[in-house]
């Protein structure tokens, strides 16, 4: 690499891990005009900066090359495979089983931008317009699944999608999901049960206000 590096550039160790997932065709294939690592660095720059595709710096591959390759990677599911294997590796390093038996469901509202379009909704509880990200993580905080809705969608209504998603990526290993009080009610409980998961609501102590540490999960 002859250009000045960007903070978003992949390190040598990171590249050694991700490269096998990204090789949809040989690195020296005749139709490849740019090094694969340079294309991946272009994608990382876009993700890190949040800039428009057409604002890609001139010392990175053309924006349309990076965009088209990113679409191929997404269609091939390489990022899901990458996250799945990395999560399993990190769990084994921590002395845990490869797949979790307990997970955590939660949701977070993200402020909208002009580009949000129809995805934006109004979260009356948090008084914020935007999108709501519903996520599932294991007890180490490693991502299992994510689902995006308008901010006005309630967390409890997304249990079905999250429960089915985590069972798919963990080969049906999950038995318990911990949630906060935003997931109370029979519907979310039954939706989780249909996927073979027991939903456990962790309640805050009513007498306490402000920051409260929930029981260890």
Model-identified regions with their sequence ranges:
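Short alpha-helical elements
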Residues: 1-217
